[in-house]
């Protein structure tokens, strides 16, 4: 169980100063008593005002982060966080019957805000439903637990991280608290140049990526905006760029010269001929349900029956009905990449090994769907990542795009430059 105090930088310095002052005063007292003989101390009692900072009492609220274990219910996780049984009962009685509160992944975390009185104030976690992860935010007001999630409470900030590899890149990134989805995306971005597992001690990774905050608590990570890996003294860079014509369809990654970063292991085929991208990968506020959701793939709107093709060579590992995904096909490719094609109306005869471009099914609206479309996912080691980083062809930059890319890259590179030669593990930038 991890505990994160809600302490401002100045309060941290104040408490450190207080601790040092106590040590110095104690040392002075000991020294004076050693020089003075037969002095009997007098006991003096005095009521002191509470310790304050900036005119208000010191905040003692803190976040508790509890990992979900296989087979856990929400009540199990809340109990381990230290929440009182009566509070757990109030939450489960009110919300326990809701389907989304029962969808907990074994590798996720539940965050509990504990107030100064020791009672729980807020609970935050993401549920995992086929194709979407939904933020559940519960807040206690007036003794009553209520759902609480609005755009006004959300803030997206770029996060900068600099990590020097010790024994392994993945281990070093994990110890620096780089989210697993960022680690896997990074692996996919540079897969055409080198393996992340091939980094040695002394190599460095510098990252800038979006982080999503709710009520001041970091709840999720977004896209990698820029990445720099120094491997054996050679610097490799990647910059995320989305042209205006791509709209909400997502961008692509290019090197420092604006060139296509890699061939993405043979992913040079779009999975279908589509009308438009109806929903990109990433976080969004649901317009009806008013909750924050991570859409774990890209939705392509297309007419019913449009052929769906394998986006690269691979092996079909699943073909059938898959919960909210409806009729779905999963294909395992090289470099640990797996793709998923959902809501199909029907399957083709393809089995086992398939070639890139081979028809595997047809667009439909099976499962949890509001109309004909293809939901396309890419995963690395089971973790959904933005398909544009690993499993879709990257277009060359046009002349118009090159100027815009250069300006965007210059800003991102300036932020990465702050990390070079500085032992920083994490910072936020407005």
UniProtKB/Swiss-Prot annotation:
Q: Where in the cell is it found?
A: Cell outer membrane
The record, for InterPro entries, names:
Cell_wall_metabolism_enzyme, Dup_hybrid_motif, NMB0315-like_N, Peptidase_M23
Tree of life domain: Bacteria
Question: What cofactor requirement does the entry state?
Answer: Zn(2+)
- What binding details are noted for the cofactor? Binds 1 zinc ion per subunit.
Q: GO: which molecular function terms?
A: metal ion binding; metalloendopeptidase activity
Q: How is it used?
A: Potentially a good vaccine candidate against N.meningitidis serogroup B (NMB) infections. Immunostimulators, namely cationic compound 48/80 (C48/80) or negatively charged cytosine-phosphodiester-guanine oligodeoxynucleotide (CpG-ODN), incorporated into chitosan nanoparticles (Chi NP) enhance the immunogenicity of this protein when administered together via intranasal mucosa of mice.
Looking up Pfam families in the UniProt record yields:
NMB0315_dom_I, Peptidase_M23
**Cellular component GO terms, alphabetically?**
cell outer membrane
What keywords tag this UniProt record?
A: Cell outer membrane, Cell wall biogenesis/degradation, Fimbrium biogenesis, Hydrolase, Membrane, Metal-binding, Metalloprotease, Protease, Zinc, Zymogen
**Amino acids binding Zn(2+):** 295, 299, 375
Question: For this protein, what is the EC number?
Answer: 3.4.17.-, 3.4.24.-
Record PTM text: Likely to be synthesized as a proenzyme. The cleavage of the N-terminal domain is probably required for the activation of the enzyme.
Any GO BP: proteolysis
On subunit structure and binding partners, the annotation says: Monomer.
Function of the molecule: Has both endopeptidase and DD-carboxypeptidase activities. Degrades cell wall peptidoglycan (PG) to allow consummate expression of pili.
Q: Which family does it belong to?
A: Belongs to the peptidase M23B family.
Q: What is this protein called?
A: DD-carboxypeptidase/endopeptidase Mpg
The species is: Neisseria meningitidis serogroup B (strain ATCC BAA-335 / MC58)
